[in-house]
Regions:
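P-loop NTPase nucleotide-binding module
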Residues: 79-124, 177-190, 196-199, 210, ...
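Short, small/acidic-rich helices and loops at N termini and domain boundaries
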Residues: 1-60, 84, 95, 114, ...
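Cytosolic-facing regulatory segments adjacent to core modules
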Residues: 76, 107, 111-194, 208, ...
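Structural recognition of the conserved hydrophobic beta-strand(s) that form the central parallel beta-sheet
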Residues: 199, 236-241
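Amphipathic alpha-helical transducer elements in NTP-driven molecular machines
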Residues: 18, 68-71, 125-129, 151-161, ...
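Pre-Walker A adenine-sensing motif
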Residues: 71-80
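Walker B catalytic acidic pair
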Residues: 202
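C-terminal regions of RecA-like/P-loop NTPase motor modules
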Residues: 180-195, 224-234, 245-330
Length: 330
């Protein structure tokens, strides 16, 4: 039956080759895993699986049931990064979107030892690794750019580099990668060595199928495909997104859902929508210097609200904030 379906697909001339190849690849992977694609499942089995998940969570005796981010308050609100979730992270330029997800990747890959794939469409893999050097070794990022390091900093750099080199981190910096190519690579990673987390920097730089009538529709198609990928591989997918300039016209410049650029169906597809905001970027006299707000504007299966993190610009690093510096939520 599968061979007949594949043969029929090959004779279609009204569909992009990449879409046909994607369906064929997915069918073969399902066959290798001895399962059907989209089969009905008796409710009894679903109930048993759900009860097993709850029992497993109870045995952990903690609030984090997913993959920890390393940020205590954020993990408490989200219970970690949950399998099959599409997590959208958005902010205006210079708020630290890339730095934030690299902090998460650092914790997940280096300290949780979980395989993490980063698709970097804006920065080269060498630039990302330099940022990771600064994060892990705590050496000033500017010193890494100039090479003006003291002896103890060289030692810390080497120690950090060894940790990074031995980690299960994968970086792909293909410019303008298409969703079909990304999906194919992720399936291969998952099949060959396992895959626990996917990070995309950033959504609007991805290429679509070319079938969409507008860029907004194309971005919506990409976000829908990313949600499908998260479900298929049962891993969290973090996608970075731009915000439109509307936020700059308001007195309160904290982002809102309506600020998502090329939004279309992005906010509907995402299980979690988060924004980054730093008051000291706009208000130089604020008493909240180097404090970032992580605003959870949407969480399909959990609470919304704001957590605060310390911002260490010399390392492009976020950190947990001491309780004495936190602002109580309304």
């Amino acid at each position: 039956r599968m061979s007949q379906s594949i043969e029929n697909d090959c004779y279609k001339d009204d569909e992009p080759v990449s879409d046909v190849m994607d369906r064929i690849e997915k069918a073969f992977l399902a066959l290798l895993q001895n399962r059907g694609v989209g089969d009905f499942v008796p409710i009894r089995q679903v109930v048993l699986n759900a009860l097993e998940n709850i029992a497993s969570a109870a045995k952990m005796q903690g609030s984090v049931t997913g993959i920890p981010t390393g940020f205590t308050d954020l993990d408490y609100k989200m219970a970690g990064l949950q399998p099959s979730d599409l997590i959208l992270l958005a902010a205006r330029p210079s708020m630290g979107k890339t730095a934030f997800v690299l902090n998460i990747a650092q914790h997940v890959a280096f300290h949780e030892n979980k395989c993490t794939a980063i698709f970097s469409l804006e920065m080269s893999k060498e630039q990302l690794v330099n940022r990771l050097f600064s994060l892990e070794s705590r050496v000033d990022a500017q010193k890494l750019r100039t090479g003006n390091l003291q002896d103890f900093e060289w030692q810390e750099l080497v120690e950090g580099a060894n940790i990074i080199a031995g980690s299960p981190l994968i970086i792909d910096d293909t410019p303008g990668i298409s969703i079909s190519e990304m999906r194919s690579k992720c399936r291969k990673f998952k099949q060959e060595q396992g895959l626990d987390l996917i990070i995309i920097d950033y959504l609007q730089l991805m290429s679509g199928s070319g079938k969409s009538v507008s860029r907004q529709q194309e971005v919506s198609d990409i976000s829908r495909a990313l949600k499908g990928l998260a479900r298929e591989l049962n891993v969290p997918v973090i996608a970075l997104s731009q915000l439109n300039r509307g936020v700059e016209q308001r007195d309160d410049k904290r982002p809102m859902m309506s600020d998502l650029r090329d939004s279309g169906a992005i906010e509907q597809d995402a299980d979690v929508v988060m924004f980054i905001y730093r008051d000291d970027y706009y208000n130089k006299d604020t008493d909240r210097k180097n404090i970032s707000e992580i605003i959870i504007a949407k969480q399909r299966n959990g609470p919304v609200g704001t957590t605060e993190l310390a911002w260490l610009p010399q390392y492009t690093k976020f950190g947990n904030l001491e309780k004495s510096h936190r602002r109580e939520e309304e």
